[in-house]
Structure formats: C-alpha cells, structure tokens
C-alpha cells in the first residue's frame, strides 16, 4: 500500500505569521500547478483524503477537476473524504500572530516540554501524533491512499514511522523535513509500519 502525503500549495498569508489551523486559502495558481503535476501520477483506485482546512480542500478539488476534464478520468474513488485528523496542529492564541511577536518565554516552555505542552493553549504535539496515528490505522489495508494535508501532519507520520508514540525527549527529536508547498512524499507500507 502506498500513502501519498501531499502538502497543500503556498497559503495566501503574510510571511512570518504563525498559522496552523488558521483557515486561509492557498494561492489558486499554485494549487492548479500542483494538481496538474500530481493528477496524472495518482494510481487508479486510490482513495483521496483531505484536511478540513480550505487550503487542502482547494487542492483536492483541483485534482478532481484535472482528472475529470483534462485527463478524462472519471475515478469516482477520488472524491475527497474530509478528515479533520489531517488538519495542521492548532496553535491556539498564537494563530495569525507574527512568530517574532510571540514571547520568547512561550517558546522556551514549549521546547522544554515539546511533547506535552499546548503551545497557544489548544493542542500539543502529543495530541497531533495521536490523531495522526488514528488516521493511519484507519487506512484501508489494500489499495493506495492520498492525503492532502500539512507539513505538521507529514512530520507526524515520519515521526510515527521511526518512533511510534514514544514521547519526544526533546524538540530536536521532531522531524524538520517536510515536502515543500505543493509537493509530496510517498511511503510504501510494508516498508514503513506504524507502531
């Protein structure tokens, strides 16, 4: 089974702002380019899941349009299944605030307890890992799946593959790599099992 982890296109937000579940649109042209690039590559029979945030849903809809109108592929299995477990982490009160305006003390507390601390008051990395692990466990055992999602969710998948739900000892344990906006990563399960 192949899991396609697709990151939404660049969001239409000022550089340097904290956003996780802040529901902002993605750049329409960048979304179209991503859909044009990925749609022909998606396997027949794949199931499409997307975050509940509009920047992910825009890409899911653009992929559907590419398959239907350009490629003339009527794969009704690629109707998107909205799954809020694929939403980005929620930064609570810090959503929409410039990163450099968030007090250093808030970052210090978060990095000292990166696993459990709810940065912004709503969701911890542990909470994110648990919901992403649940979404992974609910994937079909056969066929391929496509997740239209966010960098934090993709990092969570990569962490779960390596460590399972083991608590993060430090913030440095958290993966820093994620696909760039409008790109993707494919994982073969059988090679990568979720603990």
Task: Explain the meaning of each model-derived region.
Residues 62, 156-160:
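Active-site signature of alpha/beta-hydrolase-fold catalytic machinery across serine-
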């Amino acid at each position: 089974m192949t899991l396609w982890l697709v990151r939404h296109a660049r969001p239409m937000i000022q550089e340097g702002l904290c956003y996780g579940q802040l529901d902002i649109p993605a750049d329409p042209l960048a979304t179209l380019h991503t859909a044009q690039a990925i749609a022909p590559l998606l396997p027949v029979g794949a199931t499409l899941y997307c975050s509940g945030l509009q920047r992910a849903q825009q890409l899911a809809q653009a992929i559907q349009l590419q398959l239907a109108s350009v490629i003339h592929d009527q794969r009704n299995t690629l109707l998107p299944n909205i799954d809020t477990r694929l939403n980005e982490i929620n930064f609570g009160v810090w959503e929409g605030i410039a990163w450099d305006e968030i007090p250093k003390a808030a970052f210090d507390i978060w990095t000292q307890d990166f696993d459990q601390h709810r940065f912004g008051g709503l969701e911890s990395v542990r909470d994110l890992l648990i919901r992403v692990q649940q979404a992974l466990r609910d994937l079909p055992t056969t066929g391929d799946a496509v997740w239209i999602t966010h960098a934090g969710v993709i990092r969570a998948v990569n962490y779960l593959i390596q460590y399972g739900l083991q608590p993060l000892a430090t913030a440095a344990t958290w993966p820093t790599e994620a696909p760039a906006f409008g790109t993707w990563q494919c994982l073969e399960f059988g090679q990568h099992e979720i603990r």
